[in-house]
């Protein structure tokens, strides 16, 4: 019995961070679909959504003299530290990542960088290139944060092309994209286990 328990894969906590605060966000829809895929078909992987809407805009005047942070920021930093890996839903604004996401990245990097040495994956949905340019800019930011992104597979969803990919509430309705999300998650799981083993 003990051998069976020790050989089982540990349950990895995937912190899902959506860069859009919009209720019916397509990027939020990708993350919700990821949570469902994990529950249905990926043992050992659990997606937990992180809400970044309560974070104040980065202002170092809000930090205390002893290096403390506002309560919402402290709670967020605790969540980042406790995660095994991250799945980011990154919309694209002006060829870059959205302000709420950059704000979250910056707060958790203040003082002791909470992102360091954590594995991550990015998915995105939008017009044009499906958010692809935001992903590449995000990867540049990740270099300084010491985030370790999986390289493949990539997922850029062209949200406005037919047939519809999302319903009016922002939920993913496309089976092919759902399968591609599964492949991203499997890659993230394998990469995370490899990094933790090292």
Predicted regions and their residues:
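Glycine-rich phosphate/pyrophosphate-binding loop and the adjoining helix
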Residues: 2-10, 148-198
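N-terminal beta1-alpha1 ligand-phosphate binding loop
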Residues: 5-43
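A general structural signal for well-ordered alpha-helical segments in protein cores
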Residues: 14, 27, 31, 73, ...
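Cofactor-binding loop segments of dinucleotide-utilizing enzymes, especially the Rossmann-like FAD-
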Residues: 19, 52, 125-127
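A generic structural motif
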Residues: 40-48, 148
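N-terminal beta-loop-helix "entrance" segment that forms/cooperates
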Residues: 49-69, 163-165
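Helix-loop-strand module that forms the ligand-binding subsite of alpha/beta enzymes
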Residues: 66-146
């Amino acid at each position: 019995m003990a051998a069976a328990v020790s050989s089982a894969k540990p349950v990895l906590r995937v912190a899902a961070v959506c860069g859009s605060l919009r209720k019916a966000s397509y990027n939020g829809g990708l993350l919700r679909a990821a949570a469902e895929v994990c529950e249905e078909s990926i043992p050992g992987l659990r997606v937990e959504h992180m809400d970044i809407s309560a974070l104040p805009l980065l202002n170092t005047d809000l930090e205390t003299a002893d290096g403390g942070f506002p309560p919402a920021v402290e709670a967020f930093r605790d969540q980042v530290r406790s995660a095994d890996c991250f799945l980011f839903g990154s919309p694209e604004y002006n060829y870059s990542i959205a302000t709420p996401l950059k704000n979250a990245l910056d707060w958790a990097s203040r003082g002791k960088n909470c992102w360091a040495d954590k594995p991550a994956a990015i998915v995105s949905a939008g017009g044009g290139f499906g958010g692809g340019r935001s992903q590449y800019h995000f990867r540049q930011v990740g270099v300084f944060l010491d985030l370790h992104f999986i390289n493949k597979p990539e997922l850029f969803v062209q949200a406005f092309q037919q047939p519809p990919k999302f319903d009016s509430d922002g939920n993913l309705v496309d089976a092919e994209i759902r399968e591609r999300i599964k492949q991203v998650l499997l890659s993230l799981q394998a990469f995370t286990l490899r990094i933790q083993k090292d």
